[in-house]
Amino acid sequence: MPGTSELITVAVPKGRLLQESSALFERALGVSPRKLLEGTRKLAADAPEAGLRFISIRAGDVASYVEHGAAEVGIVGLDVLREEPRDLYEPLDLGIGRCTVIVARPKGARPLPRGVAPRVATKYLSLAARHFAAKGVPAEIIPLHGSIEVAPSLGLADTIVDITETGETLRANGLVIEEKVLEVSARLVVNRVALKLHPERLRRLIEALRAAVAEAGAEAR
């Protein structure tokens, strides 16, 4: 059994992904980060029987923790990875946290006059800019971090780029999806230095999770 200093640190995001990823870890290794972390004020919990330490942090920060070596492994949405590319090894699509980054406009909105740059409200500054640039559209990107769906109704933007799971919030705000930008799911990411320092232990972790993902997928079919 590894000592405390030898545990592999896994950064798991708070919220829905913590619950979904916990099911995979429980299936793969018999440990649940959600169960270990719940009922405590601490943001870290050890599972020495699996050789792991789990830390619970904000979803948008997981990639930074792993890239800079504060955690060896993490779970990150593909939207985060494509918005701000990182020097990380991405060995596995976990098949959880499925959503779509989309372009949406008010239902029944008239097309903008030719030559008029659309005002696009979004938290995905890079993804949105690349998407419209690829279409040859000189969009004005308006950075927002919340309540993006109301921007068109308040006259702040003509269009939004946002992430959605069911589209219900979009419909409730009178918006319709025009395009899909990126299909999103959570990915397992690994620090590249850690991969050289602990190749066998990380390989076993990756393969155990890979088998759990395949098993969960087979059951869902």
Curated annotation (Swiss-Prot):
<dbReference type="InterPro" id="IPR024893">
    <property type="entry name" value="ATP_PRibTrfase_HisG_short"/>
</dbReference>
<keyword id="KW-0067">ATP-binding</keyword>
<keyword id="KW-0368">Histidine biosynthesis</keyword>
<comment type="similarity">
    <text>Belongs to the ATP phosphoribosyltransferase family. Short subfamily.</text>
</comment>
<dbReference type="InterPro" id="IPR013820">
    <property type="entry name" value="ATP_PRibTrfase_cat"/>
</dbReference>
<keyword id="KW-0963">Cytoplasm</keyword>
<protein>
    <recommendedName>
        <fullName>ATP phosphoribosyltransferase</fullName>
        <ecNumber>2.4.2.17</ecNumber>
    </recommendedName>
</protein>
<keyword id="KW-0547">Nucleotide-binding</keyword>
<dbReference type="InterPro" id="IPR018198">
    <property type="entry name" value="ATP_PRibTrfase_CS"/>
</dbReference>
<dbReference type="GO" id="GO:0003879">
    <property type="term" value="F:ATP phosphoribosyltransferase activity"/>
</dbReference>
<keyword id="KW-0028">Amino-acid biosynthesis</keyword>
<comment type="subunit">
    <text>Heteromultimer composed of HisG and HisZ subunits.</text>
</comment>
<dbReference type="GO" id="GO:0000105">
    <property type="term" value="P:L-histidine biosynthetic process"/>
</dbReference>
<keyword id="KW-0328">Glycosyltransferase</keyword>
<dbReference type="GO" id="GO:0005524">
    <property type="term" value="F:ATP binding"/>
</dbReference>
<dbReference type="GO" id="GO:0005737">
    <property type="term" value="C:cytoplasm"/>
</dbReference>
<comment type="function">
    <text>Catalyzes the condensation of ATP and 5-phosphoribose 1-diphosphate to form N'-(5'-phosphoribosyl)-ATP (PR-ATP). Has a crucial role in the pathway because the rate of histidine biosynthesis seems to be controlled primarily by regulation of HisG enzymatic activity.</text>
</comment>
<dbReference type="InterPro" id="IPR001348">
    <property type="entry name" value="ATP_PRibTrfase_HisG"/>
</dbReference>
<comment type="pathway">
    <text>Amino-acid biosynthesis; L-histidine biosynthesis; L-histidine from 5-phospho-alpha-D-ribose 1-diphosphate: step 1/9.</text>
</comment>
<keyword id="KW-0808">Transferase</keyword>
<dbReference type="Pfam" id="PF01634">
    <property type="entry name" value="HisG"/>
</dbReference>
